């Protein structure tokens, strides 16, 4: 009889008393060789520790290698790139923005540490050889496909955040053309790991932690060549094994809303194994219901002049904010029906440049009522929405949703609509934001917020600075 495996439950830890012998020993054992694992290995090695990385893949990279590797940095007067572009960025503005963006779930200590250490973070990366060009990509875009560095990767210029802190671009892209930042970043990080003589074991699956009766972590059980090996970690285990976007059972259990999105962002190893290993020894997993969800409705940026409406023909968000914030609110709508309506001319080269994939489902040349009927919206609703929007847009204001004047103009016939309803073809990529509760210095915490000795977590295995898609900015996880 085959007993189904519950892939949403923690693994049972191995008791220290049951370990007959150690197959391997190291000072620091790191689980996962993506961006966070590489950074942890470099830092630990530079502090004099013997470090061993275990990764289930056959090469380094993780989800970082699949990303654009934008990193959100600033404050302290500005990074070298910000200053070269004539920008001054205060730590307090950066802090206030991130606190507001993460709302009531924000961790003030983590946000403060992130902002105050951001300039050092930038300089550390530059010291490792990560290239950043001293240029600004001053366009509304999801990523810079040129080798320019600096761009807005959040909702800093949009309501309500533009009323909280002075906007400043903080997304830093590597000096490489195309969407190739992730591979280059991991190449550089891997070279730095190798240069330090860090031991790396690939095709090694971490199974469970080894703990004593006081729940102190002493090591980890790893499967290598189909054999279980007990690894002693004299100074600690660091879990850098990613999130759980690839684990359907964990998504159903903790974050079912994300199942409405279309495609997980990550690598096959993002199964939540690191989170489960931590939970098994008493770690608190927090914010597990939250995830990043994107609706990449720009480029072309001209679609920002359009409006997004729901099944009631009503707007629900200021369309000039970050695509992640829009994606979050799209999933909250009645029946999740969402349409993007814009002047025909503003669709521009949509079919060539867009990532969205949404289909045209209605056009109107004679009247808004015609479009309303084609979209099967309640009679009069869309007509009223557009009439109110146009009246205010003509005056450069949006009292309902506070879209900035830069992106306000009346909607004029002919109009067209894209079906952005989840499940109808529109691209809704997602990843998870929940993870193990940690101190800003990485120590894993219990539900009572006591430290589990010998256990640390980073990357998406930990619940870090970002806490909600509604305020997410690319480059903070």
Each language-model region and where it sits:
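Glycine-rich FAD pyrophosphate-binding loop
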Residues: 46-66
């Amino acid at each position: 009889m085959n007993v189904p495996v519950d892939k949403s439950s923690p693994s049972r830890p191995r008791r220290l008393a049951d370990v007959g012998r150690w197959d391997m020993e190291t000072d620091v054992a790191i689980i996962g060789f993506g961006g966070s694992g590489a950074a942890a290995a470099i830092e630990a090695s530079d502090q004099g520790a013997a470090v061993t990385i275990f990764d289930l893949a056959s090469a380094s990279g993780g989800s970082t290698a699949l990303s654009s590797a934008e990193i959100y940095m600033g404050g302290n007067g500005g990074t070298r790139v910000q200053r070269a572009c004539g920008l001054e960025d205060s730590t307090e503005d950066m802090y206030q923005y991130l606190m507001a963006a993460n709302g009531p779930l924000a961790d003030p200590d983590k946000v403060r540490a992130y902002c105050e250490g951001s300039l050092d973070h930038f300089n550390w990366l530059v010291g490792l050889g990560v290239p950043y060009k001293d240029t600004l990509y001053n366009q509304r875009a999801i990523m810079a496909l040129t080798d320019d560095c600096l761009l807005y990767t959040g909702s800093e210029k949009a309501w309500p955040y533009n009323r909280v802190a002075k906007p400043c671009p903080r997304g830093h892209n590597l000096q490489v053309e195309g969407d190739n930042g992730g591979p280059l970043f991991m190449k550089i990080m891997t070279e730095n790991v190798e240069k330090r003589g860090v031991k790396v074991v690939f095709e090694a699956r971490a199974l469970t932690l080894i703990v004593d009766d006081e729940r102190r972590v002493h090591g980890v059980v790893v499967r290598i060549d189909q054999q279980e090996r007990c690894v002693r970690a004299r100074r600690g285990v660091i879990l850098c094994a990613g999130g759980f976007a690839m684990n359907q059972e964990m998504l159903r259990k903790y974050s079912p809303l994300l199942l409405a999105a279309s495609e997980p962002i990550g690598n096959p190893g993002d199964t939540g194994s690191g989170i489960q290993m931590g939970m098994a020894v008493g770690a608190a997993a927090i914010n597990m219901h939250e995830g990043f969800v994107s609706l990449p409705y720009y480029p072309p940026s001209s679609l920002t002049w359009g409006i997004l409406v729901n099944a009631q023909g009503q707007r629900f968000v200021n369309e000039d904010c970050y695509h992640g914030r829009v994606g979050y609110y799209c999933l909250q709508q009645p029946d999740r029906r969402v349409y993007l309506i814009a002047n025909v001319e503003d669709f521009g080269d949509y079919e060539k440049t867009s990532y969205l994939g949404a289909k045209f489902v209605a056009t109107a040349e004679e009247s808004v009522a015609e479009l309303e009927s084609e979209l099967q919206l309640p009679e009069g609703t869309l007509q009223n929405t557009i009439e109110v929007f146009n009246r205010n847009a003509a005056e450069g204001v949006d009292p309902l949703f506070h879209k900035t004047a830069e992106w306000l103009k009346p909607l004029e016939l002919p109009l067209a609509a894209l079906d952005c309803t989840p499940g109808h073809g529109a691209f809704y990529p997602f990843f998870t934001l929940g993870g193990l509760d940690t101190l800003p210095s990485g120590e894993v915490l219990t539900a009572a917020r006591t430290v589990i000795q010998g256990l640390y977590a980073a990357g998406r295995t930990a619940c870090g600075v970002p806490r909600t898609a509604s305020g997410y900015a690319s480059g903070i996880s």
